[in-house]
Amino acid sequence: MDVIDELPRAEFAFPGPLRDRLVAAILSGAKTSTSALLVGYERANEPLPEVGERAAVVDSEDRRVAVIETTEVRVLRLADVDLQHALDEGEGDESVAQWRAGHETFWHSAEVRAELGDPGFTVDDDTLVVTERFQLVHTI
């Protein structure tokens, strides 16, 4: 077994076009941050990422394509996410409002609501978000 196979998986969005775009942005170096709902970690009983932790990025075909290392983790109110974080997500957003609109659409999707087990889930200014900065260590 290769060392890469022992690393935890870093999955961005759900398999499909969005994941493909996010993985491409990671591989190009454009994406150096991400965000997730704190409630998602809690419902899955998963620990938050930790600084120095490495993970294998998986693509839509479930292949490990890169290794990233966490460099910062913050838990913030959705209203407190800053412009630098939004820009560093590498999705082309030019403002926090644009970033938030895109993320609200994703977080209100049927897939996220199903994953959370809450068909009526919505976010607001006080929703807690885990923001994570990472660096690309290498591609596979």
Predicted regions, residues:
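Mixed-charge, low-complexity intrinsically disordered regions
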Residues: 1-67, 73-140
